[in-house]
């Protein structure tokens, strides 16, 4: 199978899994935009729109490859003008629920809402200032989640019910 076909299948699988979980059309594949790539997927979570980039790897990517994937995700998110970027890494022979999802901590804070994070963890003014800086710091650390954890973070329990 050609690499382009593998990518198309992966993007479609991510779209289908997210839409099934969310219970509505929260994710769609993005058409190519020439040299100004806008990512592979457009994902809507409440009032945020995220750019999704997908990568298929036969084995776990090296640190250098992973950094390149993250940089590409940031660039494509900027090109698309969206609220944050999300990197999906499919490793051969893993179920979709165990695919890795990488997002910047700033995207995580946008998804959770800065005020709800501060309230939940009872943070002081200094911690609030650090979190606010993370929202504008595009090179800040990334979080690694599983696909299942990402979907639960964004949409809670699946619309079709637990255990089905």
Q: Which role fits each region the language model picked out?
A:
Residues 1-164:
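Catalytic phosphate/metal-binding cores of nucleic-acid and nucleotide-processing enzymes, i.e., regions
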């Amino acid at each position: 199978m050609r690499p382009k076909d593998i990518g198309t299948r992966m993007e479609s699988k991510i779209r289908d899994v997210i839409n099934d979980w969310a219970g509505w059309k929260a994710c769609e594949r993005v058409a190519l935009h020439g040299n100004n790539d806008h990512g592979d997927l457009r994902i809507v979570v409440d009032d945020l729109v995220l750019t999704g980039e997908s990568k298929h790897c036969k084995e776990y990517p090296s640190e250098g490859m992973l950094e390149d994937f993250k940089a590409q995700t940031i660039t494509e998110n900027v090109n698309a003008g969206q609220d944050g970027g999300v990197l999906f890494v499919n490793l051969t022979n893993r179920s979709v629920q165990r695919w890795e999802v990488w997002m910047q901590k700033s995207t995580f804070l946008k998804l959770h809402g800065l005020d709800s994070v501060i309230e939940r963890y009872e943070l002081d003014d200094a911690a609030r200032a650090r979190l606010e800086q993370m929202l504008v710091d595009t090179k800040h650390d990334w979080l690694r989640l599983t696909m299942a954890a990402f979907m639960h973070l964004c949409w809670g329990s699946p619309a079709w019910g637990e255990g089905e």
